[in-house]
């Protein structure tokens, strides 16, 4: 995984996501999930392209089950975009890079 992608856990979620001074895109995933693996290159590309403007992270739902339950994650992949500590966009299923970029750009205006 790219060094630009932050590993998010139940333990660091508040600091990395809710208290971040820039928007944060969190990919809720699991290793056994085929569609989640399809998103890996897209997530890594977005992390590089938006470095310094948006924090991009991944949270493994198998190893961290408190945070997904707080945000009503019932299917993966789910991507949630957070801004100022609030979930502002929730997308379930595999999304195109174009769709994810549009969601990010809307929050950067």
What are these regions (language model features)?
Residues 67-76, 80-88, 94:
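Structural alpha/beta surface segment adjacent to cysteine/selenocysteine redox centers
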Residues 83-109:
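Non-catalytic, surface beta->alpha helical segment in thiol-disulfide oxidoreductase systems
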Residues 21-22, 28-32, 75:
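Short pre-active-site segment immediately N-terminal to redox-active cysteine/selenocysteine motifs
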Residues 21-23, 38-59:
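Conserved helix-turn-beta segment immediately C-terminal to the redox Cys motif
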Residues 59-67:
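Structural microenvironment flanking redox-active thiols in thiol-disulfide oxidoreductases
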Residues 5-24, 65:
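A short beta-strand-turn-helix
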Residues 1-4, 109:
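N-terminal targeting signals for export/organelle localization
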Residues 28-42:
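Conserved redox-active cysteine motifs that mediate thiol-disulfide chemistry
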């Amino acid at each position: 995984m790219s060094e630009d992608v932050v590993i998010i856990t139940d333990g660091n979620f508040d600091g990395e996501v809710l208290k971040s001074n820039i928007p944060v895109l969190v990919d809720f995933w699991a290793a056994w999930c085929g569609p989640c693996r399809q998103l890996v290159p897209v997530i890594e590309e977005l992390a590089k392209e938006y470095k310094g403007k948006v924090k991009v992270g991944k949270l493994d739902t198998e190893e961290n089950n408190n945070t997904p339950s707080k945000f009503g994650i019932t299917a993966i992949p789910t991507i949630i975009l957070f801004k100022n500590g609030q979930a502002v966009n929730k997308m379930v299923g595999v999304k195109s890079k174009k769709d994810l970029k549009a969601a990010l750009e809307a929050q950067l205006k």
